[in-house]
Amino acid sequence: GLGDVYKRQDVDCHHTIEDIGIALGTAIKEALGDKAGLVRYGSCMLPMDETLALCAVDLGGRPYFVYDASFAGQSCGGMDTQMAREFFYAVSYSAMMNLHLKVLYGENDHHKLEAMFKAFAKALDAATRRDARIDGVLSTKGTL
């Protein structure tokens, strides 16, 4: 009703980031609905200064995750760099998407992380576009 709810939860970084990935993936899956008219596939090669990252997405309903990125440091901006993999894995499986992420090259860990997140956003945006030429879902089986 009229009250405010506030809950402070002290949870480790790993579980917090993983839970955020699960929540985002679930929200993406629910927002896509039956996927009628969706382009389904999207990719982005994104430069961030000296870094180049690649992301490819298939919203076909079969979760799979490929990740190829390494970092010089254990943390970046207060986040454990290993948690990027955990986040994207959780998004991929919760959204039921095939997700490939690769940092082709780069030196600065911040640029690598930022390029991966932005490439993912751009690839997802491309895959979720609707095309009037697509009748139903883009699948030879007729279902995703």
Identify the residue ranges that each predicted region occupies:
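Short, small-residue-biased leader/transition segments that mark boundaries at the very start
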Residues: 1-6
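N-terminal auxiliary interaction/assembly segments of multi-subunit proteins
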Residues: 7-15
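Ordered, amphipathic secondary-structure segments that act as subunit-interaction surfaces
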Residues: 18-39
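Solvent-exposed, glycine/polar-rich loop segments of beta-barrel outer-membrane systems
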Residues: 68-75, 133-144
